[in-house]
Amino acid sequence: LVRRGDHALIQGEIPLSFLNKIQQVKYRLNPFIVNTAMLLEERGVSVGKFLPIVHYDLPPKPVDIAENKESRKKYRREAAEVMNKRAAEFKRSCRTRMTMEAVARFKDREFYIPWSFDYRGRAYPIPAFLTPQDTDFGKSLLNFADAAVMTEDAEEWLAFQVATTYGLDKATMQERLDWTRTHVSLIARVARNPIDHIGDWEGADEPWLFLAACEEYDACCLRQTRNLTSLPVATDATCSGLQILAGLARDKSTARLVN
C-alpha cells in the first residue's frame, strides 16, 4: 500500500498501478449544472446539499434612536437577531460557498484528481471538493473530459442513472430501465427547464445527480442532439463487507447471499 505522509512505505505494483490509473482520468465541469447552480445561488434557493447563503438585512434605525432609550433597546434586540441569523446562515452555507469558489476557479478548465490510500487500503480523493466522493451536488458538477460515443449500452446506463438517482437504487436493472422509459415527459421537463420545474426534481433521493442524468438522457437519447456522452454513471455495492470476505475466502455459499 501507499500511505500519504508515511515514509515507511510498503509498495506494491498493483496498488501503485491502480492509483496512477484513476489519477489519469481527466475531468471537466458540467456546464448545465454550473449554470443551474449559479441561477439558484443568485436567488438564494436551496436544493438538497446545495445551500446558498441567504442574506438578511438589518432593520432600519429609528429616527429617535439617539434620545429614545426604549427605541434604542428595541433596535439593538432586532439587529442582534438578524446578526445571529447571518452567522447561522454563514455556517450552514459554508460547503456550498467553498464548492462554488472551486467552480469559479475550474469552470473553463480540464483537471485531474489526486488520490491516496488510507490505512486500510481504500482509495480516497485528496481534495475536499469536486470529486466522485463529494456530496450529491459536488458529484453532479463532474463530467469526464473525454466523452464516449453513444451506443445502445450507453443509453441503458444513462437510463439506469436517471432511475437510480431518483430513488430506485434498490430496484432491479430492468425495473430501473422501465421506470425511466415511462417517465420521459418528467425527464424532458426537468432537463429543459430546471428552474421553473424545480418541484419535479428537488424531491429526488439525489436531486442534483438526477438533474444531471435527466439532461444527459434528454440530449443523448430523447432529442438526440448529442452523440457523445461524458456523464459519470455510478454503481455501488450493498453488503460490500460480506462480498469482500466471501471473495477472500472463496466461499461460494456466502457469495450467493450478497448481490
Residue ranges of predicted features:
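Non-catalytic nucleic-acid-binding interfaces of large nucleic-acid enzymes and RNP effectors
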Residues: 1-259
